[in-house]
Amino acid sequence: MSMTELSGVRTFLLGLQERVTAAVAEVDGGDFITDAWQKEPGEPLQGNGITKILENGEVFERAGCGFSHVQGSRLPPSATQHRPELAGAPFEAMGVSLVFHPRNPYVPTVHMNVRMLAATPVSAGPAEAVCWFGGGMDLTPYYGFDEDAVHFHQTCKDALAPFGGDKYPRFKQWCDEYFYLKHRQEQRGIGGIFFDDFQELGLEQSFAMMQSVADSFLPAYLPIVRRRQSQPYGARERDFQLYRRGRYVEFNLVWDRGTHFGLQSGGRTESILMSMPPLASWSYQHRAEAGSPEERLYKEFLIRRDWV
């Protein structure tokens, strides 16, 4: 990948961060704090980034959106599970990652990430760098609504349609398999799309597909926020929201490759953990009441299901 191509990816990602945070700030009425950072000389990773975070807003308790562009001397194990030939290779990675935790339990939590990684096998020269893209988005409701799930998945499907009819079903299944808490035997949410190590369309079209996914995020999520943000709720709904947020914490710390990659490679911990909810709770052997909306979430939404 040339310097010009790398610059194009960086420019797109920075613009994406600006567009998303501006739109979310307009919905919430609050302001994002901008924290630009630079890695110090001598650290395992070199590079820079911008973390934007909104906390204690009207709509969002925490909304974090981070851009990072880093270089390292050795790919960490979390990035070479499917590419053993790249173990220990120097690499360059950049991406935008966001997680929004709403205040109202009827508004779902959302995660989106798009990224590019280039690595040079130890035995190769710079011209032989291997480059791939990854990304996706997924929705984690606390109370399920069919119309929200259908809208989210349809928007994801439409974003991938120009790149082949096989992409949505493949990436939807990948998402279902990835965002699964093995120790709980539960889906994290209703899924969405997920792809990684992707280069099969060639550099230009693979980047275009990543851009299409990124550009579909606001149309996929904000209509759901607007539909649910003023819905009345009480202590019961809030308690269940906090309990389910505990599952989010468990997944991110135990299973998420992105979190592991950041921590294993010497990334910026404060930015990596901005995905954590501001409040969460755990209750021993919690059981949803039979026939309740909470039970419906488990039976009808936290399952692998074709929404479109």
Swiss-Prot record:
InterPro entries per the UniProt record, alphabetical: Coprogen_oxidase_aer, Coprogen_oxidase_aer_sf, Coprogen_oxidase_CS
Listed GO CC annotations: cytoplasm
Location of the active site: 111
Catalytic activity: coproporphyrinogen III + O2 + 2 H(+) = protoporphyrinogen IX + 2 CO2 + 2 H2O
Superkingdom of source: Bacteria
Co-factor requirement: a divalent metal cation
Keyword Manganese in annotation: no
Pathway listed: Porphyrin-containing compound metabolism; protoporphyrin-IX biosynthesis; protoporphyrinogen-IX from coproporphyrinogen-III (O2 route): step 1/1
The entry's keywords: Cytoplasm, Heme biosynthesis, Metal-binding, Oxidoreductase, Porphyrin biosynthesis
UniProt GO molecular function: coproporphyrinogen oxidase activity; metal ion binding; protein homodimerization activity
EC numbers on record: 1.3.3.3
UniProt KW Oxidoreductase keyword: yes
Signal peptide: none
PROSITE patterns with a match to the protein in the record: COPROGEN_OXIDASE
Region Important for dimerization, annotated ranges: 248-283
UniProt: substrate binding residues: 97, 113-115, 266-268
PANTHER family assigned: COPROPORPHYRINOGEN III OXIDASE, MITOCHONDRIAL, OXYGEN-DEPENDENT COPROPORPHYRINOGEN-III OXIDASE, MITOCHONDRIAL
Function: Involved in the heme biosynthesis. Catalyzes the aerobic oxidative decarboxylation of propionate groups of rings A and B of coproporphyrinogen-III to yield the vinyl groups in protoporphyrinogen-IX.
Family label: Belongs to the aerobic coproporphyrinogen-III oxidase family.
Protein name: Oxygen-dependent coproporphyrinogen-III oxidase
